[in-house]
């Protein structure tokens, strides 16, 4: 259903929709795959390379990435940016020390890059550099994705796309039950 919803949204906005499976990992250098394995850390790098390649080899003004587990609730949703790139923003709700907390985070489940974007090649180089120098036993799942983007956002002030968020387990459980502390924030 997720893929179908994104495909429908793409048609609604006259975007070209493409699905890429594990071939995505073919874009990741061998040394990187050896260090990280096939998973989110490798996908973070591959996504950037794929989008850069699409911008340089196709006649497009911009590219938009939506993760395979994104579900589009409203086909009228707009994804655009006044800057050369944009990333998702979510309000993540979870319990911390017995209290529900809501935090705004940046994520890369959705991202947009335009032609001539200087951030995209910088991100590719930075992600490779971080992984090259990282201790393989200390690579965190979001190290070169959301955590890196959040750190850079404090310096660069990316355009954010809050219309594409994520639902924590606490929020999902409260939605399912129709009530709960995660929905009261």
Model-based region annotation:
Residues 40-95, 103:
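GT-A fold catalytic core of metal-dependent nucleotide-sugar glycosyltransferases
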Residues 75-143:
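Conserved catalytic core of nucleotide-sugar-dependent glycosyltransferases
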Residues 12-14, 53-62, 116-117, 155:
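Secondary-structure boundary elements
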Residues 13, 66, 106-107, 145:
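Residues that flank catalytic or metal-binding motifs in active/ligand-binding sites
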Residues 1-36, 42-43, 114-118, 134-137, ...:
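N-terminal anchoring/stem segment of glycosyltransferases
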Residues 118-185:
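Catalytic core and acceptor-binding pocket of nucleotide-sugar-dependent glycosyltransferases
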Residues 4, 45-49, 143-151:
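A structural signal for well-ordered alpha-helical segments within the folded catalytic domains
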Residues 24-26, 70-72, 92-93, 116-118, ...:
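Short, solvent-exposed loop/turn segments at secondary-structure junctions
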């Amino acid at each position: 259903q997720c893929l179908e919803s994104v495909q429908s949204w793409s048609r609604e906005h006259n975007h070209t929709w493409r699905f890429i499976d594990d071939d995505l990992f073919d874009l990741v250098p061998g040394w990187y795959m050896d260090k990280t394995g096939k998973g989110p850390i490798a996908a973070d790098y591959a996504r950037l390379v794929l989008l850069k390649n699409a911008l340089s080899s196709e006649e497009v003004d911009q590219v938009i990435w939506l993760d395979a587990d994104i579900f589009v609730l409203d086909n009228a949703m707009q994804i655009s940016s006044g800057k050369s790139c944009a990333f998702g923003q979510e309000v993540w709700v979870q319990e911390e020390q017995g209290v529900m907390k809501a935090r705004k985070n940046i994520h890369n489940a959705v991202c947009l890059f335009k032609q001539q974007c200087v951030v995209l090649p910088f991100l590719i180089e930075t992600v490779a550099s971080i992984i090259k120098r990282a201790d393989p036993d200390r690579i965190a799942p979001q190290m070169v994705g959301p955590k890196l983007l959040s750190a850079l956002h404090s310096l660069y002030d990316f355009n954010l796309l809050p219309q594409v968020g994520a639902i924590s387990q606490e929020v999902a459980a409260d939605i399912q039950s129709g009530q709960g502390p995660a929905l009261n924030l």
